[in-house]
Structures are given as structure tokens and as C-alpha cells.
Amino acid sequence: MMKKVIVVGAGILGASTAYQLAKMGADVLIIDRKDNGQATDAAAGIICPWLSQRRNQAWYRLAKAGARFYPGLIEELQSEGETETGYAQVGALSIHDDLEKIDKMEERANLRKADAPEIGDITRLHEKETRTLFPLLAEGYHSVHISGAARVDGRALREALLRSAQRNRAVLRDGDAVLQVQSNRVTGVAVGTETFAAHVIIVCAGAWANQLMQPLGINFQVRYQKAQIMHLQIPDREDTGDWPVVMPPSDQYLLAFDRRKIVIGATHENEIEGYDTRVTAGGMQEILNKGLEYAPGLANCTFQEVRVGFRPFTADFLPVLGAVPGWDGLIAANGLGASGLTMGPFLGSQLARMALGMPIDIDLNDYDIRKAMD
């Protein structure tokens, strides 16, 4: 019998989950209410977890698996005719003006290559070579170049996944889903006046998940952080599509996309009242101050837009996923934070397998959903 699965939330995680389920032959309904501030909608992803100094091994295992998962997924999407995936393996420059820090970075990359060959070539570049690859940079920065790194446009990838899922008979509905229950089983969802039944419901609702779970008496402890991300256009270049991603020694990043687009960001705003999607003067100032410090060549760029998204986090900054305790038929995943585009597609494949009762490739104890529920 074909298993009916409803996925609530069509960000990178929900879209990836639905895509995998549809490919595996499930009967899939995706419901999304298109809230402003979806993290995926705003996000520009850097797929380069190998240089991270985060000491949390459970986080690194997921991020590494996420990066490894991408090339196969993109190849699959392309074979289905999806050419606009927003993904390109353009390499990354991790820049610093302190040569000792460059030494440490190079050392870290080489150590991690042992169990992550997808990192590609690791090359140390001096100042001139660094600026040749990304001409807008300030003088004085050396870099470590990682050839296996990639960049992805969250919105483009999500749309490609959803189109492909729909070609495999998944149905996408706009609307506000309300969970339907009978005793301790979640049986489906209501959207407006319609009700849809399913064997499994998967909640991938990011910063809004708690609203969905509260009627069941679940307090899903997911906080969110506001990100403002700025898009600029270079006036005089032929194309910037093959420029590497730039990772400065801060919480900022610089990405070049096709058609002379440069994306810089992002803010990390924690004390947000409600879902405040406004672009603020202070947010823009922070992005520009930091961006121009690393890349003064941005000064002559044309301002295009600022996108705003809410990154969901758990208390220990680790994703959580699994069957929701006390309720049959309900699975949830959340808390991908700033790593959503790195981990989302891989975690979607794991959620799909979980929903269909197939073995998964990660130890769920590391990401136990009970940690985020009381």
C-alpha cells in the first residue's frame, strides 16, 4: 500500500523531505502558508563546514554529511531537467590577515580531509592570489582556498526540489495546517474547511513550529534569530558566477552569484519581538560596515534588496529530529540554525526514510527531539 505522508512547511527541510518521499513512491502532500521571513527564502548558503572551529562533533558530523550529500542530489535534479538549482561548486577563500591563523586553518583543513575527501584541494594563497580570485577584497588578506566548497541560493534550490517532487505526483498546497488527532494519534491536518488524512505527518515548520504543536500540549522549544542579508550588483564586471565564496574571520560572509550579484551578510539578531521582518537601518549599517571593511570594492556596487529570514535554533544549537513522544504518526525536525542549507537536503533524506520505516544513517540519540520538548 502506498504510504500517505503530509509535510508541513516547504523550506529547505520540508522541500527536501517531500522530494525524497515522492521519489520513493509515497503519496505526498506538502502544505505551506508562505509566511514572510522563511529562513530558506532569504538564505545564501556556504557549503564549507570543514574549516569550522565549532567543537561539537554531533554538529560537525551532520554538516559534513550534508556537504557530502550535495553533488549527488544536484546531479539527480539536473538529470530530471532542473538546471536552476542555485548550486555551484565555486570553492571558498577563508581569509585572514594573521599568518599564524592561516597556518592553523590549513592544518585543520588537512586533518579533516582524511575522512572528508570531498573537501577537494587545499591551497594556501598569498595576498595577490587571493585578490585575483575575489578582486573586491581589501589588501592584506591571505587565504586558504578549499576547492570542494560550494554556494547555494536557498530559494532556487527549494523551488527545484518542489518542482521535481510535483513531477513525482506530490501535491503542494498553500494554507495554514492544523493537526488533527484521535486519542494519541495524529491522523492528518485540516486546511481551512478541508481535512487531509495521512499515515505520517512531518512538521518542518522552522521558526513557526511551536504554533502548530501547542494545541497538542507540546511546548516545542525552538527560538529564532533574525537575519538580514543584502544583495548588491557589481556595475562593471562581465560575470561573477565562478567567484569563490569568501569567509572572513567574523560571522559575516561574501558570496558572488551569476549576473554580477554579490550577497553580503548577515545579521544575527536575537531579541526579536514577534516575527518582525522589517529591514532596519541598524541592520543595513552593520552589514555594510563589516562588508566594506573586508571588501572596499563593494562601495561602488548598486544596492538591490535586503532579504530577511528567521533561523530556528534549539537551546544547545543542535538540530533535533525524530518521532514526537506521546503521539503516533507525528515526526518533527527543527533547529538547523545557520547551517540549514548545508544540512537540510541530507536531513530531508533521513526524515523521508524515517517516515517510511527505513533505516537511517545517523544516530538519533545525538539529535533527540525530547531535548526540545517539555
Can you describe what each PLM-predicted range is?
Residues G297-D374:
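C-terminal catalytic lobe of FAD-dependent flavoproteins
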Residues I46-L133, K290:
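Dinucleotide-binding Rossmann-like beta1-alpha1 core, especially the glycine-rich loop
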Residues V144-G192, F196:
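Helical element adjacent to the flavin cofactor pocket in flavoenzyme catalytic cores
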Residues D32, H126, D174-D176, E305-R307:
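Short loop/edge segments at beta-strand edges and connector loops
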Residues I6-V8, F196-W208, G348:
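Short hydrophobic core segments
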Residues R61-K64, D98-I102, V144-A160, R278-G282, ...:
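Short beta-strand to alpha-helix junction loop
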Residues S16-M24, R33, G45-I46, E82-A88, ...:
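Active-site substrate-recognition segment that forms the wall
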Residues K3-L29:
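N-terminal Rossmann-like FAD-binding beta1-loop-alpha1 element of flavoenzymes
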